[in-house]
Amino acid sequence: MSFKINQVNKLPAVKDAILIEGLPGIGNVGKIAVDFIIENLKAKKIFEVKSKKFPNSVFINEKNLAELPKIEIFYKKVKNRDLFFLSGDIQPIEDESCYDFCEKILDTFESFKGKEIITLGGIGLSKPPESPKVFCTANTQEIIQKYKENNNINSNLFGLVGPIMGVSGLLLGLGKERNIPSISLLAETYGHPSYLGIKGAR
């Protein structure tokens, strides 16, 4: 099996859960945002994803020790809503591995009757934006209208961006095949590989 999801803590009964994904990408906007939410809410780690399909490298942590890259799923109930957060150091690089990974995540999400998916990412610009705009695309019109209501979000993405690569895009497409409403929120950021899009993440 390419990807194995290990449960590391007990999961309470959940209903109509929402999955929020923020893995590394353009400007690391999604990762910065999700990691901040996890820390702020003190979300609890429930699952760890293991795979030999991850990049053949290690990361140096705050204690100056080497550790394998990881992807984890956290949980927190907020105002009677069950929220899951998908966070990690990396995402699968190869096309087939990315598909396999997303299918495994969706299998797990469906197992506890997940209702909706939100993916977070960036739109790379040629220079850092002063006031980053947030755009969205989704696999249904209904979820676009839901998130645009009372929020300053622009859904006119056609012709502005190319394909949405990686997990953030595939979860929308594969989610549609499973009738899971899914939306991607994309913030403007500087497109340089080493740039951290903190403004966009906010």
Predicted stretch roles:
Residues 47, 84-86, 116-118, 135, ...:
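Hydrophobic/aromatic beta-strand patches that form the interior of the parallel beta-sheet core
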Residues 90-95, 157-158:
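Surface-exposed cleft-lining segments at the edges of enzyme active sites
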Residues 23-29, 92-94, 122-127, 164-165, ...:
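Gly/Ser/Thr-rich loops at beta-strand to alpha-helix junctions
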Residues 32, 36, 104, 170-174:
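Alpha-helical scaffold segments in soluble metabolic enzymes
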Residues 1-90:
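N-terminal short beta-loop-beta anion/metal-coordinating cradle
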Residues 126-202:
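Catalytic cores of processing enzymes, dominated by hydrolases/peptidases
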Residues 35-39, 102-104, 200-202:
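Short, solvent-exposed amphipathic alpha-helical segments in soluble enzyme
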Residues 93-143:
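Internal, conserved structured core segments that host functional sites
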